[in-house]
């Protein structure tokens, strides 16, 4: 498998380690649903692009302090099935956290993850999970070296101007009586690179 040849800063590529099958690999956990529907893919993409536009136009009033400045330019994201496959294989492992190596031949790949847990079999809406990433903007100060990635890193990846493509995967499973809803989105090229600004201000 060609993914075994892809180099990352650390670890073996997710698709080399676990193979390219998108079947769940959750051990003793009971899988309720695996993967996103076409409709959910479209919703996630639309939500990202609408939020990127809002920020780029200078209409996001939240921040620390707000509002966020408008952007000189920001790519419109398109869906990428390869990024989605890599995200799905990782979600299938039911192991909440970031994988070590998820790059494609084309890009270094960034990642956002979210998990919702409910005690009953309640449906967790993917758009609410994406909204959690958007809401990190309340702690973000444009251009400040004091921003902490563990507080705002999902937001900054969402609006990283140079990112062009996105692909996501999900797993709904039961672990220790809890219903876990796990969402993984991969982004190419990756955001949150060194000291680069998330976007150039207008």
Swiss-Prot record:
Disulfide bonds: 4-16, 8-101, 26-94, 168-185
Disulfide bond as UniProt keyword: yes
A Pfam entry, by short name: CAP
Subcellular location: Secreted
Entry GO CC: extracellular region
Coiled coil: none
Family classification: Belongs to the CRISP family. Venom allergen 5-like subfamily.
Stored SMART domains: SCP (SM00198)
Record protein name field: Venom allergen 5.02
Main localization of the protein described in the UniProt heading: secreted
Domain SCP: 46-187
Keywords in alphabetical order: Allergen, Disulfide bond, Secreted
Tissue spec. comment: Expressed by the venom gland.
InterPro entries per UniProt: Allrgn_V5/Tpx1_CS (IPR018244), CAP_dom (IPR014044), CAP_sf (IPR035940), CRISP-related (IPR001283), V5_allergen-like (IPR002413)
Keyword Disulfide bond: yes
């Amino acid at each position: 498998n060609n993914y075994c040849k892809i180099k990352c800063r650390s670890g073996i590529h997710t698709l080399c380690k676990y193979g390219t099958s998108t079947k769940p690999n959750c051990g003793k956990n009971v899988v309720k649903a695996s993967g996103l529907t076409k409709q959910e893919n479209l919703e996630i993409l639309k939500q990202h692009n609408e939020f990127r536009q809002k920020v780029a136009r200078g209409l996001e009033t939240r921040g620390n302090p707000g509002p966020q400045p408008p952007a000189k330019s920001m790519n419109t994201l398109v869906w990428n099935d390869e990024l989605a496959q890599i995200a799905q294989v990782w979600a299938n492992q039911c192991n909440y956290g970031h994988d070590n190596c998820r790059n494609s031949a084309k890009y270094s790949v960034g990642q956002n993850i979210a998990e919702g847990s409910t005690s009953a079999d309640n449906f967790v809406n993917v758009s609410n999970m994406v909204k959690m990433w958007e809401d990190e903007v309340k702690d973000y100060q444009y251009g400040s070296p004091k921003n902490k990635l563990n507080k705002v890193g999902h937001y900054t990846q969402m609006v990283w101007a140079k990112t062009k493509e996105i692909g996501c995967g999900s797993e709904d499973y039961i672990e220790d009586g809890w219903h876990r809803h796990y969402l993984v989105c991969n982004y190419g090229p990756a955001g949150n690179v060194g000291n680069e600004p998330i976007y150039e201000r207008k």
